């Protein structure tokens, strides 16, 4: 029986300890790897990792990096994170590969129609790095794009310290109400910022099932899939 394809998007910040200046946390990466190893028994996993632990927009401004170039630095950061995580997963005996929208010879595989069609023929977990390969597009947009391209049945979006969608920013407004389930159209009507509009519109048009959850919570990916933790479900 063929395993279903899913996409998981996590931030680069989720790989580091907030109390440290290091780019990576051994404990967090181990926890993530253990969850992925368990999930790989039931699913073909497409993984998209942000690059914010290495490079962020504020750093670009501080150094005077032009926006287009800054976007490419950020995309390269996702390649670095994906390659590091791939090595960790391979050490656990998992079959993995890193695909990239930016060519990195000897390190990544090219993203093209053929590689996408055959992506899980020889691996359990595929990293989609390098964003869309173009500036001005977010990691959220890249996530939705890859989900469409591999016919993912489920898309999980891990947020830093936020366990789903609220009526307002819960960090600024204590009266903000948690939303357990919502349609794409309702979210658009209420102007809820779940992700950038390009990504959200793409997801709506292709009828993707989204689960928004707190990546920082213990065993959060597994618990979200098994409906055992707090998260928001978005569908048409």
Curated annotation (Swiss-Prot):
Presence of keyword Lipoprotein: no
Chain sites annotated for binding UMP: 51, 71, 132-139
Record-listed E.C. numbers: 2.7.4.22
Classification via Pfam families: AA_kinase (PF00696)
InterPro entries for this protein: AceGlu_kinase-like_sf (IPR036393), Asp/Glu/Uridylate_kinase (IPR001048), Uridylate_kinase (IPR011817), Uridylate_kinase_bac (IPR015963)
Subcellular location: Cytoplasm
GO BP: 'de novo' CTP biosynthetic process; UDP biosynthetic process
Gene3D superfamilies: Acetylglutamate kinase-like (3.40.1160.10)
Recorded GO CC terms: cytoplasm
Reported regulation of activity: Inhibited by UTP.
Source superkingdom: Bacteria
Major place of residence: cytoplasm
Assigned keywords, A-Z: ATP-binding, Cytoplasm, Kinase, Nucleotide-binding, Pyrimidine biosynthesis, Transferase
Pathway: Pyrimidine metabolism; CTP biosynthesis via de novo pathway; UDP from UMP (UMPK route): step 1/1
Any one GO molecular-function label of the UniProt entry: ATP binding
Catalyses which reaction(s): UMP + ATP = UDP + ADP
Positions bound to ATP: 9-12, 52, 56, 166, 169
Entry similarity comment: Belongs to the UMP kinase family.
Its job: Catalyzes the reversible phosphorylation of UMP to UDP.
Subunit structure: Homohexamer.
Name of the protein in question: Uridylate kinase
Organism from which the protein derives: Mycoplasmoides gallisepticum (strain R(low / passage 15 / clone 2))
